[in-house]
Curated annotation (Swiss-Prot):
The gene is ctaG. It is found in: Cell inner membrane. Pfam families: CtaG_Cox11. InterPro entries: CtaG/Cox11_dom_sf, Cyt_c_oxidase_assmbl_CtaG. The chain crosses the membrane at residues 10-30. It comes from Cereibacter sphaeroides (strain ATCC 17023 / DSM 158 / JCM 6121 / CCUG 31486 / LMG 2827 / NBRC 12203 / NCIMB 8253 / ATH 2.4.1.). GO terms for molecular function: copper ion binding. Belongs to the COX11/CtaG family. This is Cytochrome c oxidase assembly protein CtaG.
Amino acid sequence: MSLSPHQKTAGGLVLVVAVMGAASFAAVPFYNWFCRVTGFAGTTAVATEAPAEVLDRTVKVRFDASREAGMPWEFRPLQREMKLKIGETGLAFYEAYNPTDRTVAGTASYNVTPDAAGGYFAKIACFCFTEQVLAPGERVEMPVTFYVDPAIIDDPDGRYVRQITLSYTFHETALTEEQAALAAESATDVN
């Protein structure tokens, strides 16, 4: 059985649409993986411990904080910058405050600039790894433990980095049913 030219064209178009649809679904996970592996777009690395090697060269790390439109929290770094040696572990704190009369959950997205530093800026522990839930009027200090990987000096672009900015943006997230129930329970008058 032979296909007519119209049937071949239609079959080819269906195949193209199917491949494009599959590629669009795979694009987001692939991009996220690519950014984690390469540090592209300022994506930081996650580490379990600091490196054994600490270099004499220092780098200035600046801290930035912002909120997504509609996020009611106040959010700020408790220090604006710090200098540390490459390979040395740093500890910085951010503060979040919920001025509302309701429990609010949020997650922090983050990035590092310049982009060349992203793959070498490693976090050991960070509030951004988990969702944060603040009760009405609650204020918390949230730590981030990090280091700059000594391998940065071997990178053709990274070796010129003298200042790195770590930026966080907090986004409001929906409370889980359990969190919402606890929030409602704590808001109920017990008299």
